[in-house]
Design a protein with these regions (language model features):
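Juxtacatalytic substrate-recognition/specificity segment
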Residues: 104, 131, 139, 204, ...
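Short coil turns that delineate tetratricopeptide repeat
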Residues: 40, 73-74, 107, 141-142, ...
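Structural signature of tandem alpha-helical TPR/SEL1-like repeats
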Residues: 57-61, 89-98, 124-132, 159-170, ...
Length: 906
């Protein structure tokens, strides 16, 4: 660890002149003696003005000002400023012309030569850059700090890390020796520290550089890049924004910010400032390819490589794309292209691995991450990529080893740290196994959830194996997290994952515990299990739209009440022309700007799958799945299965949608808001009608909605709103009329509140319990996320002796919330009346975990259940625990006597 001498600013300023003079004496480069008259005030003013214009992003004006400096004494400074102004606008040839004289005698003009070398690197001439910097270093006793660091970066790029480290260490030694004072040089020392894996030092040095000069845009952005490299987006964003407050056209800051927020807007701004900014072009290209917009992405990458043929990120993106398509000839061509200037580049392989992992190609990602580590065992990013992808393949032990190795050497990487912390969480979890599954969940969930999840998993397995004719690799690993943050970190490495509630990686599934949800957890499990099948069937090659579309379509196949019914959203999307072409469906996921957009992407994908199932049949859907197991163009796959090209298929889908909208035949007002909910359909979606009723005067709202239904009798939302308003006014007859009309218009509506739910409330207010229960039952035909309604119906069915009905509604309630004691009391009573002693035991065991209000009664009930199920030893031990607390409890004493009688009789 290098010593950091954070000398106070005042001391630094006091020492600057003396040390600078000493440095000049030591340097092999000395300025010619100039007479006092040579200090041309007008030239200095021009330099200051040019610097100010550069700082504020007025690059063309800066070019004009710097071009007016004609004093030889300031020539190097003017050319540095002029070249930078040209470079900031992508005028690399003009910048090179300005700097060209440094190429002849680089040691005499070290700053110019260093800037020229940086330009060579930007334009894909690292060999020339290496030679130029070598000449400066060899020709100078004390070459500039920037020269040392840039030389190290070039040597690193060209694969000579050991030689690079020599120059990075020289830069740090210069700082430790008290010979670095300027903000720009301190920032370069920070870069050297970062390259030497001294991340704490790098952070402190960047901080010092910015403290010395708050306008050092380069330092602000390089510091932000360090944060972003460690997945600390919050601090990175702060740095980029600080730079942009000074210069809103500073392209490096815009590119950095684009990786965090508003990517297309910020990248477009960067390219407006510099249309030849390779980082912006490469980032845009990678984003487009990741979103399935290959032609656009390839165009950006070609532009980047035309400017810098040695851009490893651009070449790695193209190579990763080739690997995903199994085009190994193209991959090898790209690899050899990289090898020509950076033999077996570790960063090249690590970038490929990261790209593949982000596209769910975990097996291939592991392969390339290993190659990166073989080339450079110090590439801690590659260790993190390898560890994360191994975990997603279920290879947790080896994955953890690589994550630990990365963390030990780079403890500031938030992603690595987060993933390791989840291992600590999992160590406290129970590990449960069934025939085909290995499940990690909290001790609480192991007692409450597992008894209901295990049979669901195995039953679902049998059904899906029979349906798809495929058996996934076992065991399938399922991890159920109590904390949303742990679920997010295990899934993507960072604690913010939005409203997702489950993720499948093919062999591993992560879920949020139902204890933190208000949704049907069984539907979620089924949805994710379908992913296990389709992803493994296609070796994780299936696009997201089809994978999500099939899983969403299968929801309704799993249970009649499951699935998404978004008729209003469909009509609204058609009205707004929001339906994407089938070939661009992945854009709906990657380009979503809100949860509502993402929810609709799921819904449209489901509609395409439903169209296939209805128009072509399940066998053709299965054939399409198998097509994705091979590497073909998507249009060829569709032609093979459906006998039509993508355009014809899309036209057929749109005609089907138009007919579906016509069949729904409901008016949707432009002012109505779409239903909103969390979990991308896995949960209640709230209708704005209830909110409107709270916000607005009943009479004015009623008159407005009456006007709407008079103009458009099939205005579902207006009828529903009128029903709510009239119910609040206790005008029950009129409320019922409008609510029944709303239900008839859209009988499968699942938003909250639905017409049937409000009708149930109306009948409850009228004292008509039978009609109330009838409406609750109607609501539950299409609403899988409600707990109160099935509970009420189960209690009534139990009271009147309709045990099958009671059992159905008990299961419906358990599917939403197995953590409420009352459902287990009803379940225990039901099981007892059905003579199912084993189920009675289960319900009382769970109830004992949940109900801490009266543990004596809970243990006594459980003891009786054990006794009835021929488990006298368990009954005796349980009732003794009850008697420890209440030794005179007569019922417990009687159960104890019954429990010990058989053993005494023996």
């Amino acid at each position: 660890m290098h010593c950091l001498k954070l000398t106070t600013l005042n001391c630094l300023r006091a020492a600057t002149l003396l040390v600078a003079m000493a440095a000049l004496l030591l340097s092999g480069h000395t300025f010619a003696q100039q007479p006092t008259a040579g200090l041309n005030p007008s030239a200095q003013e021009l330099l200051d003005r040019g610097q100010e214009l550069l700082l504020r992003g007025s690059y063309l004006a800066a070019v004009e000002v710097y071009s007016r400096v004609d004093d030889d004494f300031f020539r190097d400074q003017a050319q540095l400023g002029l070249s930078r102004a040209h470079m900031e606008t992508g005028q690399y040839a003009q910048a090179e012309a300005v700097l060209q004289r440094a190429a002849e005698e680089p040691a005499d003009h070290p700053e110019l030569a260093t800037r020229l070398a940086e330009l060579y690197v930007k334009t894909g001439r690292s060999g020339q850059a290496e030679a130029l910097l070598a000449a400066v270093v060899d020709g100078q006793l004390n070459p500039p700090v920037r020269t040392l660091v840039q030389y190290g970066l070039v040597l690193t790029l060209r694969g000579d890390r050991d030689a690079a480290d020599v120059h990075f260490n020289a830069a740090l030694a210069r700082y430790d020796g008290g010979m670095v004072f300027e903000s720009a040089d301190v920032a370069m020392v920070a870069v050297a520290a970062r390259q030497l894996d001294e991340f704490h030092d790098a952070n402190a040095l960047f901080s010092e550089a910015v403290r010395l000069d708050g306008n050092n845009l380069e330092a602000l952005v390089l510091w932000g890049d360090l944060f972003q490299d460690k997945f600390n987006d919050q601090d990175a964003q702060t740095n980029y924004n600080e730079a942009l407050e000074i210069n809103r056209r500073y392209a490096p800051a815009l590119v950095g910010l684009a990786r965090i927020e508003s990517p297309e807007r910020n990248l477009s701004r960067a390219l407006d400032a510099n249309a030849r900014n390779v980082a912006a072009l490469q980032t845009f290209g990678e984003r487009m390819i990741r979103n399935g917009r290959d032609e656009e992405g390839l165009g950006f990458l070609r532009q980047a490589l035309d400017i810098n043929p040695e851009s490893i990120p651009a070449l790695a993106t193209l190579a990763a794309r080739a690997a995903m398509k199994d085009d190994m000839d193209e991959f090898e061509r790209l690899r050899q292209r990289v090898n020509a200037f950076s033999p077996e580049s570790a960063s090249f392989y690590a970038s490929i691995a990261e790209f593949l992992g982000n596209n769910y190609r975990f097996t291939e990602a592991v392969e390339y991450a290993r190659r990166a580590i073989d080339r450079d065992p110090r590439n801690w990013h590659a260790h993190t990529v390898l560890g994360g992808n191994l975990v997603r393949l279920g290879e947790e032990r080896e994955g953890k080893q690589h994550l630990e190795q990365a963390f030990d050497n780079d403890p500031f990487n938030v992603l690595t740290s987060n993933m390791l912390q989840v291992f600590d969480v999992l160590e406290e979890y129970a590990t449960l196994e069934s025939e085909h599954f290995r499940v990690n969940m909290s001790q609480r969930d192991a007692q409450i959830l597992w008894p209901y999840m295990e049979p669901l998993l195995e039953d679902s397995w049998d059904r899906l194996v029979a349906k798809y004719g495929f058996e996934p690799e076992v065991p399938v690993v399922i991890q159920v997290f109590e904390r949303t943050e742990d679920f997010a970190v295990r899934s993507v490495g960072l604690p913010d994952i939005g409203p997702l509630v489950g993720i499948c990686f093919g062999k591993v599934v992560t879920l949020i515990s139902p204890d933190t949800l208000s949704a049907n957890w069984q539907e979620i499990v089924w949805h994710e299990l379908v992913h296990v099948f389709t992803l493994q069937m296609t070796h994780n090659r299936m696009p997201r739209w089809l994978s999500e579309g099939i899983s969403t379509w299968e929801e309704r196949q799993g249970r009649p009440e499951w699935g998404r019914r978004q008729g209003l959203d469909l009509i609204r999307a058609v009205q707004q022309d929001r339906l994407l072409p089938v070939g661009n469906l992945n854009d709906g996921f990657t380009g979503a700007n809100s949860d509502a957009d993402l929810s609709f992407a799921y819904f449209q994908s489901f509609l395409v799958v439903e169209y296939i199932a209805e128009q072509y049949g399940f066998e053709d859907l299965l054939a399409l799945i198998h097509e994705y197991a091979e590497i073909r163009d998507e249009s060829e796959m569709f032609a093979n299965v459906f006998g039509v090209d993508m355009a014809t298929f899309d036209a057929g889908f749109r005609a089907w949608i138009e007919q579906r909208v016509a069949d729904i035949n409901v008016y949707v007002h432009a002012e109505d808001s779409p239903d909103e909910g969390e979990g991308h359909g896995h949960g209640v979606r709230e209708n704005s009608s209830a909110i409107l009723a709270e916000l607005y005067n009943n009479e004015s709202l009623k008159q407005y909605m009456l006007g709407r239904v008079q103009r458009e009798p099939r205005d579902f939302q207006a009828h529903l709103q009128l029903g709510i308003v009239l119910f609040r006014e206790q005008a029950y007859t009129e409320a019922i009329r409008h609510l029944r009309t709303a239900h008839e218009l859209l009988p499968d509506y699942t938003g909250y509140p639905s017409p049937s739910l409000v009708l149930a409330q109306v009948y409850e207010a009228m004292g008509d319990e039978e009609a109330q229960r009838e409406q609750l039952a109607i609501m539950l035909e299409h609403q899988q996320h409600d707990f109160a309604a099935p509970m009420e119906l189960a209690e009534h069915a139990l009271q009147v002796g309709e045990l099958d009905q009671a059992a159905y509604y008990v299961e419906r309630a358990l599917a939403v919330n197995p953590y409420r004691p009352e459902i287990h009391r009803i379940g225990a009573e039901l099981a007892s009346r059905q003579g199912d002693t084993q189920r009675t035991v289960l319900e009382y065991e769970v109830l004992l975990t949940l109900d801490q209000n009266d543990p004596v009664a809970a243990r006594t009930d459980l003891a009786q259940a054990y006794l009835d199920n021929s488990q006298p030893d368990d009954a005796r031990m349980t009732v003794l625990r009850a008697l420890e607390t209440a030794p005179t409890y007569e019922r417990a004493q009687q159960i104890l006597l019954q429990a010990v009688e058989p053993s005494e009789g023996d």
